[in-house]
Amino acid sequence: MAEMKARYHDARHHCFAWQLGLDGMNYRVNDDGEPSGTAGKPIYGQIRSNELSNILVLVVRYFGGTKLGVSGLINAYKAAAADVLANSKIVERTVNSVISFHFPYESLNDVMKVIKEEAPEIIHQKFDLSCSIILSIRQSR
């Protein structure tokens, strides 16, 4: 954000919303001098309606000579956030757990059959007299 504020230093407002994590509990909205609730909340509303997380949306606004009023500001920030999200590449990631397990060599075929069916990411594997595998498994589907 500091980079954007420096780049657009002559703008009147740099309003934003962000959300981290999947539970929606870690977020922040900022109106940067606009009337309370007219900038950050509409931006955050677009983040929520698109079901996004681990995201920051910053809207830079220049004063164009016409006062927009409360509803005009809300609509302008909402539309700007909607536009940027519609034209952004959304990257989907899964939440994974890393598990490690050890088993006797005699069980290798059974273990590998299950791994082949479930197709987790194999992080590390070692096959000696006893075997060990570290897997990254998606927490939910």
Language model features: what each stretch is:
Residues 1-38, 124:
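C-terminal regulatory domains involved in ligand/effector binding and gene-expression control
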Residues 36, 40-49, 60, 73-77:
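Conserved mixed alpha/beta catalytic, RNA-binding, or beta-rich assembly cores of soluble enzyme
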Residues 53-63:
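Glycine- and acidic-rich phosphate- and metal-coordinating loops
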Residues 77-96:
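Long, charge-dense
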Residues 90-105, 133-135:
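Short glycine-/aliphatic-rich beta-strand segments at the starts of folded cytosolic domains
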Residues 102-120, 141:
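Short amphipathic alpha-helix segments
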Residues 127-131:
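N-terminal positively charged helical leader segments and presequences
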Residues 135-137, 141:
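Terminal, non-globular segments
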